[in-house]
């Protein structure tokens, strides 16, 4: 089980990303537009740098929905391998059977 503070910190980052997504996207489009003047593009970069660091989507960490574990995360299911194995052994995931050969 992960520390509650780590999970909460990640949730706060998700909220910030959602809040600043439109503004960040607009500034990036201006900054990467070669048709605009260099001065205007530079100002867009400065405004982008003023946004909160945690409003960038790259700072979000995928975490298990059950345990908060940050590693061995299966995107399709939203859980870690440990939780997947546990639920699979209990028969709570339809279609998942233990391999045998």
Swiss-Prot record:
Keywords: Ribonucleoprotein, Ribosomal protein, RNA-binding, rRNA-binding. HAMAP family: Ribosomal_uS14_1. Pfam families: Ribosomal_S14. Signal peptide: none annotated. Binds 16S rRNA, required for the assembly of 30S particles and may also be responsible for determining the conformation of the 16S rRNA at the A site. PROSITE patterns: RIBOSOMAL_S14. GO terms for biological process: translation. It comes from Methylobacterium radiotolerans (strain ATCC 27329 / DSM 1819 / JCM 2831 / NBRC 15690 / NCIMB 10815 / 0-1). PANTHER family: 30S RIBOSOMAL PROTEIN S14, SMALL RIBOSOMAL SUBUNIT PROTEIN US14M. InterPro entries: Ribosomal_uS14 (IPR001209), Ribosomal_uS14_bac/plastid (IPR023036), Ribosomal_uS14_CS (IPR018271). Part of the 30S ribosomal subunit. Contacts proteins S3 and S10. It comes from the Bacteria. This is Small ribosomal subunit protein uS14. NCBIfam families: PRK08881.1. GO terms for cellular component: cytoplasm; small ribosomal subunit. GO terms for molecular function: rRNA binding; structural constituent of ribosome. Belongs to the universal ribosomal protein uS14 family.
